[in-house]
């Protein structure tokens, strides 16, 4: 026994490999740094997360971020994805609703100066709207940090708590959260996919309004009108009838 202890003491500390149990994945990993999982463990953990959806039945990682990531990185990225998805869903809905209700004085538009595409509403809305909004955002973000972040300040300030499920802030006023794990994972996947679609949608909304200078529904109606006229032209051409001219406002769409 004494001989074994002397041999162990003779091994340099720098060459010892530590065995750490990952608190998130529950797997035992061996690495040169305590708690650092090998890439296989990171990939295996990522495959267990909600959001793995057809046609990408495996983890969708074309840029290879997982190759150099840790489980902590993956958890932090998932938290960011959920947060950005939720904001994008609100933004996409806000674009459409804001453009339809901009004529209602109740919505901080007492003088009717808020009009046109939603990309210009930011500059048109008065200061009385932004101060309460910034306070509300600050309160919401402070609550999210308090619930989920392990170290709000200092090194690794945005690391998540080991027992925190990314995106789960305990906000469920309607009691919609399933108690069955599989049902919960399915619902989480739906939220992620809707958030991903919303992030693409809000980017498309902004690009479309910058190029076309028209509101979302207005563009949709004009596009439909143009398609009808073009189809009518084909019929008229086949029948030898005079062609219906395309209005100037539809030519650029």
UniProtKB/Swiss-Prot annotation:
Membrane topology classification: Multi-pass membrane protein
UniProt GO MF annotations: chlorophyll binding; metal ion binding
UniProt family annotation: Belongs to the light-harvesting chlorophyll a/b-binding (LHC) protein family.
Chain residues that bind chlorophyll b 1: 45
SUPFAM superfamilies (alphabetical): Chlorophyll a-b binding protein
InterPro entries registered for this protein in UniProt: Chloro_AB-bd_pln (IPR001344), Chloroa_b-bind (IPR022796)
Residues that bind chlorophyll b 2: 86
Induction pattern: Transiently induced by transition from dark to light (at protein level). Induced by high light stress (at protein level).
Binding site for chlorophyll a 4: 194
Binding, chlorophyll b 4: 144
GO cellular component term of the entry, any: photosystem I
Described function: Required for non-photochemical quenching (NPQ), a mechanism that converts and dissipates the harmful excess absorbed light energy into heat and protect the photosynthetic apparatus from photo-oxidative damage. Is able to sense luminal acidification of the thylakoid membranes, which occurs along with elevated electron flow caused by excess light, and to induce a large, fast, and reversible pH-dependent quenching in LHCII-containing membranes.
Name by which UniProt lists this protein: Light-harvesting complex stress-related protein 1, chloroplastic
Transit peptide start and end: 1-39
Amino acids binding chlorophyll a 5: 190, 208
List of residues binding chlorophyll a 2: 84
Keywords: Chlorophyll, Chloroplast, Chromophore, Magnesium, Membrane, Metal-binding, Photosynthesis, Photosystem I, Photosystem II, Plastid, Stress response, Thylakoid, Transit peptide, Transmembrane, Transmembrane helix
Compartment(s): Plastid, Chloroplast thylakoid membrane
């Amino acid at each position: 026994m004494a001989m074994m202890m002397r041999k162990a003491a003779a091994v340099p500390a720098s060459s010892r490999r530590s065995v750490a149990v990952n608190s998130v994945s529950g797997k035992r990993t061996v690495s040169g740094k305590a708690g650092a999982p090998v890439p296989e463990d990171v990939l295996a953990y990522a495959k267990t997360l909600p959001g793995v959806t057809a046609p990408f039945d495996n983890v969708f990682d074309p840029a290879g971020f997982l190759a150099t990531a840790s489980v902590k990185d993956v958890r932090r990225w998932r938290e960011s994805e959920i947060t950005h998805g939720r904001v994008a869903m609100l933004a996409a809905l806000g674009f459409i609703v804001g453009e339809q209700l901009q004529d209602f004085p109740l919505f901080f538009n007492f003088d009717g100066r808020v009009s046109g595409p939603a990309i210009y509403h930011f500059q048109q809305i008065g200061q009385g709207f932004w101060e309460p909004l910034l306070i509300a955002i600050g309160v919401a973000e402070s609550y999210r940090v308090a619930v989920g972040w392990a170290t709000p300040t200092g090194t690794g300030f945005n690391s998540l708590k080991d027992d925190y499920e990314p995106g789960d802030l305990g906000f469920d006023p309607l009691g919609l959260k399933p108690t069955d794990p599989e049902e919960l994972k399915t619902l989480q996947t739906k939220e992620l996919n809707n958030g991903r679609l919303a992030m693409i949608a809000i980017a498309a909304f902004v690009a479309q309004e910058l190029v076309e200078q028209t509101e979302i529904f207005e563009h949709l109606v004009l596009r439909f009108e143009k398609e009808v006229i073009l189809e009518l032209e084909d019929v008229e051409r086949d029948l030898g009838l005079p062609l219906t001219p395309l209005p100037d406002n539809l030519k650029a769409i």
